[in-house]
Each structure stands twice: as structure tokens, then as C-alpha cells.
């Protein structure tokens, strides 16, 4: 990689510098020979520095070519994208808000809102946003970001997404940006690859299913429901979307923005190597009943 290419000469020079003067030529020759030799890695997981299970998971879900390209890209430092209001937000998160398509004066529920990036962006379109999250600490973060960006129509509310205090069919649009394995944002959280495990995905899918079901109850007839996660495992995307109950018709997200690859019934996903963005998946429905 570029990082390795840069680091090797530095490492060689540093080592030569501490060697006895009479041995420096010998040390330099040996180290540079080793540095230029082809390395036979025991596996892609070792080569790219990821847990075995994670590499296997993504290869199973996306095929070897896309999975390895994704893993390689997430070892590269991400670009910084700043909105006009000064908030730094990855393009994929902004594309999710495009799927919500919040309109002026509409009442929007962002049911897993912290840190508030999506809520403030939807408010910038003139919508009234109820930004809910499960703890005071998290809603304070939302409120602080709303104040910093001038998003005066955002109301931060402590509310558990699986036991919603809101009336059924109360909102024009609902965004369920659910907690997930975060495998699409590992370029921002490099250590997270070693903290998550396969069992965590199974636990998260149970939570995601409940969050989507409760979010669906809050949508008005004719309103829109959007489910998004910053991961691209099938278990947390297509399989969760398939649990949506009767009364909802799928909206083709690819027709709204062609950055997405097709995923399941009407959904879409983007991999980090596609658009220099985080990995993200999104599904959208209209309530017809």
C-alpha cells in the first residue's frame, strides 16, 4: 500500500542510523533487500489487518472482488466533507436524507438521532424534526449540534425507539437510522474492527427489527418510512427490510439517486470504493394503509 511504501524507507533509515558505523552498509543492504521482497501473506485477513470472520462475512455477502476492495479502501484515511452550515458529514449520510426527502413544514421523526447530523440536515429543508434517542447524554449532543448549525426546528427528545411514546400515524416521514455493526465506517473507527464480533450482528438484528416495526407505526397514511444503517451485511439490511409489515409499498431508491447499488426489494447500498464515502444501506417505503 501507499502507507507501506512510505514507511519502509523511513524504517530502514532509522535502523541504519542506530547501527555501528562499520556495519551500516551491511545493515542497509540487508534491510532494503528484505523490504523489496514480495511478501506471501497467509490470508487476506492478515494482509489487510481485519478479523477472519469479518472478511468471510463480507466475501459471503458481496463476493470476493467487492469485499476485498471495500476492506482495502477502509484502510485509507477518509476525505472530509463539510456542509454549508459547517457540519462535517459523510456524503452517504447526506444521501440517506435525500431518501427521506423532507419537505417544508412536514413533521419528521428521526428515531435514532444522535449525534444529529441527519436531523439538522432535514431541518435545513424546512421540516420540523423530532430528534429522538435513548438517553439524555445522546439527546444533549443532538441539541448542541442543532444549536451550532442553526437548526431551530429540531427538538431533541429522550425516547426509546422500541417503546415509542409518540402517537401512531403522527408523522409525515420517519427515519430509522438504526444502531448497527458499523462495518461501513471502519475507515473512521479503525479499532472497531477488533471490538465487534459475529455474535453482535445477531443481537443487533433483533434490535433493528423492533426499531423498524415501531418506526412504521408512527408514519401517517401516505407518509414515508426510511430505514438506514452504516453497514452492508445482508442480515442487517435486506433481511431487516423483509420484515416490514403489510400496508407499506417499497419505494425504488435507485430512481431517486443513482449512487446506490440495488439491494433487496427497492433498496440500495453503497460501498466505500464506489463514491469515496462510508458504506451505507437504505430502504424506503410509502404507507398505503
Model-found features: residue ranges?
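S-adenosylmethionine
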Residues: 4-289
Amino acid at each position: 500500500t501507499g502507507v507501506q511504501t512510505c514507511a519502509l524507507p523511513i524504517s530502514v533509515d532509522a535502523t541504519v542510523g542506530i547501527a555501528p558505523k562499520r556495519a551500516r552498509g551491511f545493515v542497509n543492504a540487508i534491510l532494503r533487500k528484505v523490504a523489496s521482497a514480495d511478501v506471501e501473506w497467509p490470508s487476506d485477513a492478515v494482509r489487510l489487518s481485519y478479523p477472519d470472520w469479518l472478511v468471510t462475512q463480507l466475501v459471503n455477502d458481496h463476493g470476493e472482488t467487492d469485499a476485498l476492495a471495500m476492506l482495502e479502501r477502509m484502510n485509507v484515511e477518509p476525505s472530509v466533507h463539510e456542509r454549508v452550515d459547517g457540519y462535517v458529514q459523510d456524503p452517504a449520510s447526506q444521501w440517506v436524507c435525500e431518501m427521506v426527502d423532507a419537505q417544508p413544514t412536514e413533521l419528521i421523526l428521526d428515531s435514532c438521532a444522535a449525534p444529529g447530523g441527519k436531523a439538522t440536515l432535514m431541518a435545513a429543508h424546512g421540516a420540523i424534526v423530532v430528534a429522538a434517542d435513548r438517553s439524555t447524554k445522546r439527546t444533549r449532543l443532538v441539541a448542541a449540534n442543532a444549536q451550532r448549525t442553526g437548526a431551530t426546528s429540531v427538538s431533541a427528545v429522550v425516547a426509546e425507539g422500541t417503546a415509542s411514546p409518540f402517537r401512531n400515524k403522527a408523522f409525515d416521514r420517519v427515519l430509522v437510522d438504526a444502531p448497527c455493526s458499523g462495518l461501513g465506517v471502519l475507515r473512521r473507527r479503525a479499532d472497531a474492527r477488533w471490538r465487534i464480533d459475529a455474535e453482535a450482528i445477531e443481537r443487533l438484528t433483533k434490535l433493528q427489527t423492533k426499531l423498524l416495526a415501531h418506526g412504521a407505526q408512527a408514519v401517517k397514511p401516505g407518509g414515508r418510512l426510511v430505514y438506514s444503517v452504516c453497514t452492508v451485511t445482508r442480515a442487517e439490511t435486506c433481511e431487516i427490510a423483509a420484515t416490514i409489515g403489510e400496508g407499506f409499498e417499497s419505494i425504488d431508491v435507485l430512481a431517486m439517486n443513482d449512487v446506490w447499488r440495488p439491494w433487496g426489494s427497492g433498496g440500495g447500498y453503497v460501498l466505500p470504493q464506489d463514491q469515496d464515502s462510508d458504506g451505507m444501506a437504505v430502504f424506503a417505503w410509502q404507507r398505503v394503509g
